[in-house]
Regions:
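Receiver (REC) domain switch/active-site residues of two-component response regulators
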Residues: 63, 216-217
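Asp-based phosphoryl-transfer active-site loop
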Residues: 2-21, 185, 212
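Active-site phosphate-binding/coordination module
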Residues: 23-113
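Residue-level marker for buried hydrophobic side chains located in beta-strands
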Residues: 9-11, 65-66, 201
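Residue-level detector of anion-binding/catalytic polar loops
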Residues: 40, 164, 217-218
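Glycine-rich beta-strand-to-loop/alpha-helix junction loops that act as flexible
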Residues: 69, 202-204, 217
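Conserved acidic, metal-coordinating active-site core of Asp-based
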Residues: 101-200, 206-207, 214
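A short, Lys/Arg-enriched amphipathic alpha-helix followed by its capping loop at the start of a domain
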Residues: 3-10, 26-41, 191-197
Length: 218
């Protein structure tokens, strides 16, 4: 649908499209209306591709989707690039960088995937298969929010290792400097080759700021 519309709705998921109890019901009617008038709804989230596939099925969405805070774009319609556009660093590389930052600041930054299932459930509210899907990361690394007094030192380290950190509602996210939600939107616009696309951006947390800054209506 993106090839046929110059208006795109690009929406965060947690706390925006769904409430903090993970309920999508309030958004379903609006999405149906947008689909009837051929306006694409592009999910743009910190969630994994595995998580978003479930949400897309529930909402009957077929448009491309942006995952892991803008580190990757997937979609069946992205045929010229075999269904994906990758902007981020591999998870294994980010893990090495997070460990290096931990040594530099003398404080252990703990990746989400290092938590036990019980600890991760307490943090996110997810369990069972939902928790498994959340752990299936390839291009970003969420980790527990560090103490605020370390934030400036961490920023200095980020410049050294050419990464960015975005603070979300529940945790922080380590990403390549080449990937965020705004850069992902621009990459998708470039791929579409449509002139003068108007972006309606929806988000609710600091990691949505690149999305909102690259939106025309927010």
């Amino acid at each position: 649908m993106i090839e046929n519309s110059s208006i795109w709705v690009v929406s965060d998921v947690d706390g925006t499209l769904m409430d903090h109890s993970y309920d999508l019901t309030p958004a379903k009617e609006t999405i149906k209306i947008l689909q009837k008038i051929s306006i694409p709804v592009i999910l743009c989230t910190s969630k994994t591709a595995s998580e978003v596939k479930v949400i897309r099925n529930e909402l009957n969405l077929t448009d491309p989707y942006i995952v892991e805070n803008g580190a990757a774009i997937y979609g069946e319609s992205l045929k010229k690039v075999n269904g994906k556009i990758i902007l981020g660093k591999k998870y294994e590389t980010l893990e090495e960088i997070l460990n290096a930052i931990s040594k530099e600041i003398d404080y252990k930054l703990i990746p989400l995937n290092n938590l036990t299932d019980q600890e991760a459930t307490e943090l996110t509210g997810l369990k069972g298969n939902s928790l498994t899907l959340m752990r299936d990361r390839h291009w970003s690394m969420p980790f527990l929010n560090p103490p605020s007094f370390l934030e400036e030192r961490i920023k200095i380290c980020c410049k050294k290792f050419k990464v960015d950190i975005f603070k979300g509602n529940r945790m922080s996210h380590l990403l390549s400097i080449n990937s965020n939600k705004g850069k992902a939107i621009n990459a998708l616009k470039k791929y579409s080759n449509i002139q003068n696309i108007q972006i309606i951006g929806l988000g609710d947390s600091p990691n949505d700021l690149p999305l909102l800054l690259n939106s025309d209506i927010k």
